[in-house]
Design a protein with these regions (language model features):
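N-terminal helix-rich module
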Residues: 7, 12-155
């Protein structure tokens, strides 16, 4: 009887430890995904402000319109993702647990109907299309906002 009780106690302790480790692992993945997305936006803004290559710089978010799963973020050089110079591409991939809840970029720029990208002007890093994207990782949600002046914030 004591052996059964000991095994049960060990199993309970193991289950509690596993739950704690699983929760910590999810928190780390959520923080990593947020940091990667912030890095993509700030890199594009900084490259534009420095005038690297004389190009506008942007970030294209590749996500499925149906499932909303964010597969990657590409920092690119060019007036748009479609017109970019692919030799400058820097791609960050995301785990399948990262989804785009909403993506709303507006402004005086020429809308392409593509709310998957933001482009920063050379030297000023002003954003012709600006707004926010809300991303969820498991149970955590973050809002990434780009101002008309190219400022990036994360909540």
């Amino acid at each position: 009887m004591e052996a059964v009780l000991s095994v049960a106690i060990v199993a309970i302790i193991f289950a509690i430890g596993f739950q704690a480790m699983s929760g910590a692992s999810q928190s780390v993945r959520a923080a990593q995904s947020s940091a990667q997305l912030i890095r993509a936006f700030t890199t594009a803004s900084a490259e534009a402000q420095l005038g690297r290559g004389g190009f506008p710089w942007g970030v294209h978010l590749e996500f499925d319109e149906g499932t909303r799963v964010l597969s990657n973020a590409t920092v690119f050089a060019g007036a748009s993702y479609a017109l970019r110079d692919v030799s400058y591409d820097s791609v960050t991939t995301f785990p399948s647990s990262v989804t785009v809840v909403s993506s709303a970029f507006v402004g005086p720029g020429i809308p392409t109907g593509n709310e998957h990208e933001v482009v920063f002007a050379p030297f000023s890093s002003d954003a012709a299309l600006y707004g926010s994207v809300v991303v969820r990782t498991q149970e955590r949600q973050g809002t990434f906002t780009v101002s008309p002046y190219g400022d990036i914030t994360h909540e």
